[in-house]
Amino acid sequence: EIQISAIDKHGNQTTKPAKLNITRPERIAAPELGAQPTYVNGIMVVNKKHPLPVNYAPGENLTAGNAVRQIIADMQQAGFDISSSYSGYRSYSYQAQIYQQYVAAHGQAAADTFSAKPGYSEHQAGLAFDIRHGNGALVTNGPAAEWISANAHKYGFIVRYQSGKEHITGYSAEPWHLRYIGGQATAVHESGQTLEEYLGVPGGSY
């Protein structure tokens, strides 16, 4: 409670009590600082059940970065209009900005179907890449998406979020989102499973 005073033009002063209510914006709960990345069979798992530490900031993985640049070069050589630019590593703070923008625009329930909360994004691991057309649009369907689906595993990638698997991965299908896992990519691809199914780890919602 505070006191508010007012003086009129005749010099008369009046003081009245008033209550000041301060509303703080909702804060996103951060993963535990002491948490460590989760590895299963040598593969890092990042999903809505397995967050990364807030201070985990490895930058772009060198091997994965070289592999995504190779797949882009090969697609361009094959005649696809694919941008040399891609969305790769994101820091915790940058992911927080992106997520909050989506929440503000679409609401949290909708945003959670296509955007990760900070600390829960594969991009923070430096192992995930979003492939774009030459005009900057994400590769969502058509021949380019089909080529990626059929060939990404040869470069150590899997298409991480598949159609019909939303209840397992926690996200809508993203044909453009590649996750580098290395030598086991072909086995995952041929199994037709999500990474959660292949490794036998929990997925779904937070």
Language model: regions and residue ranges:
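Extracellular and select intracellular beta-sandwich modules with Ser/Thr-enriched
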Residues: 13-18
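Extracytoplasmic cell-surface/polysaccharide-interacting catalytic and binding patches
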Residues: 19-206
